[in-house]
């Protein structure tokens, strides 16, 4: 017989121990997935093929808005596992949705977004997970024309404009790209800074993560970059 009037006492230590067991049993096995699982995965394709798929998808989107994708299709299959063909580090700008821009289905892209498409420690960890556990063959850093955060970095760098809250920290991460662009004396300072920020992101992905860097050196992973044109829909 159950005694519903008596509740077991749980100490803080027992709760922590239980949570630790759950994490170990439920999450950690995903890291270092079996080789045979990765070989059978649909995303086990060369980096060059993954990049070509993105290019083809963007061409479709820019031409006619892309395919009429049923986002509910194959929902049951996606519950079992995710097998994205690429990782995308994109700006948070609401006009720059990677899945739509590249005309991809749910489950095709592993996306990390923040204002200014900046490489952060959390972003690095996310892509390290995608490389080691999901086997993505490609990571693209995606900037866009007219990026407001890069414009703020320009103002902070050239006009010494003060920014509120945590914005200075974000702008500081972009400032090296602005300085590099300024040294090249471009006719369009903002456009050049946006492009340099993409290049900076690509470099940081390879140099700040041993996991990502080694995957690139081994030829298993490619780091690419692009700038999205809001007017034409084209990524270059």
Residue ranges of model-derived segments:
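N-terminal secretory signal peptides
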Residues: 1-10, 21
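Divalent-metal-activated hydrolytic enzyme cores
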Residues: 16-17, 22-23, 37-81, 107, ...
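Short glycine-/acidic-enriched loop or helix-start segments at secondary-structure transitions
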Residues: 27, 98-99, 150-152
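Sec/Tat signal peptide C-region and signal peptidase I cleavage site
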Residues: 31-34
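Short beta-strand segments
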Residues: 89-91, 113, 140-144, 224-229
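Active-site cofactor/substrate anionic-group-binding motifs, chiefly glycine-
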Residues: 92-95, 99-117, 122
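Gly/Ser/Thr-rich loops at beta-strand to alpha-helix junctions
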Residues: 94-95, 144-149
